[in-house]
Amino acid sequence: MSPQTETKASVGFKAGVKEYKLNYYTPDYETKDTDILAAFRLTPQPGVPPEEAGAAVAAESSTGTWTTVWTDGLTSLDRYKGRCYHIEPVAGEENQYIAYVAYPLDLFEEGSVTNMFTSIVGNVFGFKALRALRLEDLRIPPAYTKTFQGPPHGIQVERDKLNKYGRPLLGCTIKPKLGLSAKNYGRAVYECLRGGLDFTKDDENVNSQPFMRWRDRFVFCAEALYKAQAETGEIKGHYLNATAGTCEEMIKRAVFARELGVPIVMHDYLTGGFTANTSLAHYCRDNGLLLHIHRAMHAVIDRQKNHGIHFRVLAKALRMSGGDHIHAGTVVGKLEGERDITLGFVDLLRDDFIEKDRSRGLYFTQDWVSLPGVLPVASGGIHVWHMPALTEIFGDDSVLQFGGGTLGHPWGNAPGAVANRVALEACVQARNEGRDLAREGNEVIREASKWSPELAAACEIWKEIKFEFEAMDTV
């Protein structure tokens, strides 16, 4: 460069490749209350030091790139860069480390889960220096949390809308999930709600297919829940899946649901995307609709222990983006969930303040300030014999959802719903009387079945059903 063309920005600039750890590994850094903190599980490639791998993650998910660039001189990298401030080995694992990274808040757009994830996990997971990478947890500071609306309504407002207190809510996914006509689908909804359930549900892939267009389904389901409400005197709901190919179509379906006067709609938040989900959550708050969230596709992202994103992070993101319910596994059914880990992210969904607890997979203390809570939904391979454990594990602020465990009853849908409602009421009463559901649960169910033939039939048909596989999601 000639003296005539030299600029201030180029003074001191030296082209070339530097080790990431020279700028992005800062073990003396004291985190700020406004930083977003991340815990990554690193598996470096052979020969790559963990400090270099952690620094690479911090760099590539913030301001860094593979080489020095002269435009670094036009900004303050020290203000905007991510910092790997601590690394620790994972006990019992070879060549695995937890790297803690702090991100300045100014790196992120306010109220945008999409931008947060694009920055933190958007590019770095394909980095060649890493054999595998998993985002285990995030600490979202109150300063960022306050830029989000969060759930449309939250737990207390939902209970007030439904006028239901002191017990878990009961639901059922209509089966078969695909192939029914809209009228037959509505019939199944009516039978389940009449039998005592609070909610029925579209499955995640029920959108608007040739055998059942969305508008027909919405109309027949609305008719079913109004009829069930008139007969039972209870407020009922059906999760009408508004997920669609475009945001405009999704909102159109939510508008029609509101015009029908139903209380709740549904969205597949991972396949639909965070931008669409946040838009729908805002519409639901403005128009008095509850929002049920299905986590379809989550296992693609969260199931591998050393690569991907843990579901506790996806759960935190959902609370920020917005949803009143979200599926959270069961611990006891067919879908995976180890007890302590599951209860860790269940607390992250419901509570205002959650302490750091590594035994439950919680790497950071999380303060949600005023963000409303989300009801966890337990579903997948559960039936009446699981009711005591589910009541004890999840407590009152939850939705217990029995699909096959309702529709598979030998006498039909309504008796299946009756069996589940009787089992739940018996467990809640036993708990309130001080009985130990973990130890006496089966006895409680047997006692209740003596005066409920529907429950007795359900107990008989599902007495041998078990899903005994080792959980992969462990600390």
UniProtKB/Swiss-Prot annotation:
N-acetylproline: residues carrying this PTM: 3
Catalyzed reactions per annotation: 2 (2R)-3-phosphoglycerate + 2 H(+) = D-ribulose 1,5-bisphosphate + CO2 + H2O; D-ribulose 1,5-bisphosphate + O2 = 2-phosphoglycolate + (2R)-3-phosphoglycerate + 2 H(+)
CDD domains to which the protein is assigned, alphabetical: RuBisCO_large_I (cd08212)
Pfam families per record: RuBisCO_large, RuBisCO_large_N
Binding residues for substrate: 123, 173, 177, 295, 327, 379
Cleaved propeptide residues: 1-2
PTM per Swiss-Prot/TrEMBL: The disulfide bond which can form in the large chain dimeric partners within the hexadecamer appears to be associated with oxidative stress and protein turnover.
Modified residues (N6,N6,N6-trimethyllysine): 14
Biological processes, Gene Ontology terms: photorespiration; reductive pentose-phosphate cycle
Residues annotated as catalytic: 175 (proton acceptor), 294 (proton acceptor)
Co-factor(s): Mg(2+)
Keywords: Acetylation, Calvin cycle, Carbon dioxide fixation, Chloroplast, Disulfide bond, Lyase, Magnesium, Metal-binding, Methylation, Monooxygenase, Oxidoreductase, Photorespiration, Photosynthesis, Plastid
Enzyme Commission no: 4.1.1.39
MF (Gene Ontology): magnesium ion binding; monooxygenase activity; ribulose-bisphosphate carboxylase activity
Modified residues (N6-carboxylysine): 201
Site, as annotated: Transition state stabilizer: 334
PANTHER family given in the database record: RIBULOSE BISPHOSPHATE CARBOXYLASE, RIBULOSE BISPHOSPHATE CARBOXYLASE LARGE CHAIN
Subunit structure: Heterohexadecamer of 8 large chains and 8 small chains; disulfide-linked. The disulfide link is formed within the large subunit homodimers.
Name this polypeptide is given: Ribulose bisphosphate carboxylase large chain
Provenance organism: Chloranthus spicatus (Chulantree)
Upper classification of the organism: Eukaryota, Viridiplantae, Streptophyta, Embryophyta, Tracheophyta
The encoding gene: rbcL
